[in-house]
Amino acid sequence: MGSETTAAGDALDALDWNKGDGLLPVIVQDADNLRVLMLGYMNAEALAVTRARGEVTFFSRSKQRLWTKGESSGNVLRVVAIETDCDADTLLVQARPHGPTCHLGRTSCFPTAPSQFLGSLDALIAEREHERPHGSYTTKLFEQGIRRIAQKVGEEGVETALAGVVQGDAELLGESADLLYHLIVLLRARGLGLGDAVALLESRHK
């Protein structure tokens, strides 16, 4: 796990463990595309183990013991950051999943909502970059290199701007979709993700 900031560490040390009889709800979010992956519970020991090992570890209410996510399946959650809410009684863990999070073999324990599609697309593009399946347009882009990808973003940007001025809504939406897709590919080609851009937008909003 990456080093915690002093402020984050102080906030975690001041958690209110009394409200939930020693247990706090924990929301786990994909650090790269910000999709919610699962909900679990931690006691103080589980949090300490999570921070020390860098792998999300919960307290199982049914088994009454600590359990590290993926301890049997290997589908662990590597911790990137841990934050607390304003009441200090709920945790948000940003992590990078190694394999499906849900025991049903799904990426998330929650069904995908329309608003989460961009996050899912970002994850799919990252997968394409890693696996390079034959016949995939995304694979072709990555193999052509970052200059070609950047060129495509420029082309789609111009086409989107023109559609906004001289074409109808359907054309504007189509060009906007193409632009978003190629922009995510460009971010991935640079080793970045959609979540990085969103985090920057959030920091500017504060």
Curated annotation (Swiss-Prot):
Keywords: Amino-acid biosynthesis, ATP-binding, Cytoplasm, Histidine biosynthesis, Hydrolase, Multifunctional enzyme, Nucleotide-binding. Residues 1-117 are annotated as: Phosphoribosyl-AMP cyclohydrolase. Transmembrane segments: none annotated. Pathway: Amino-acid biosynthesis; L-histidine biosynthesis; L-histidine from 5-phospho-alpha-D-ribose 1-diphosphate: step 2/9; Amino-acid biosynthesis; L-histidine biosynthesis; L-histidine from 5-phospho-alpha-D-ribose 1-diphosphate: step 3/9. Disulfide bonds: none annotated. GO terms for molecular function: ATP binding; phosphoribosyl-AMP cyclohydrolase activity; phosphoribosyl-ATP diphosphatase activity. One of its GO terms (cellular component) is cytoplasm. It holds the Pfam family PRA-CH. One of its GO terms (biological process) is L-histidine biosynthetic process. The keyword ATP-binding applies. This is Histidine biosynthesis bifunctional protein HisIE.
